[in-house]
Curated annotation (Swiss-Prot):
The keyword Lyase applies. This is 3-dehydroquinate dehydratase. The gene is aroQ. Keywords: Amino-acid biosynthesis, Aromatic amino acid biosynthesis, Lyase. Homododecamer. Belongs to the type-II 3-dehydroquinase family. Substrate binds at residues 73, 79, 86, 100-101, 110. Its EC number is 4.2.1.10.
Amino acid sequence: MKIMIIQGPNVNMLGVREVGIYGAMKMEEIHEQMKLAASQNNVELDFFQSNFEGEIVDKIQECLGTVDGIIINAAGYTHTSVAIRDAIAAVALPTIEVHISNVYRREEFRQKSLIAPVCSGTIVGFGPFGYHLALMGIIQICEQIKNLRAMQQAQQTNK
């Protein structure tokens, strides 16, 4: 199983930027923790970070046929990007949206996600641990899909 982790604008500044909101852990440290959990679950991870909307859209499109699922923190683009929303919908892969802070306790404009309706799930407010929760969730979803396909294949074979 292969999962793409996509980090949006300013996520590369974790540990420096607004530590009171996002905590002191750097993006690279989050990725290292995810790699450890992934290795324990026989999962391969790829990581991508960009501050540019078009690059994020390109990366989502590249996921089609190459990964089993996506974990995305679209950061500020969560609230503004129809293009990212449409890319997620187009590839139709299991996708989990992650936010380190609880966006529902913050400014009103942060409380509306354009991408949530096309994601399998959303995890907010658990700090960096939210990425671990997202990883466990995407593994579960991908396993369910794999098992469903195997059952369908077996039914077709038995006809």
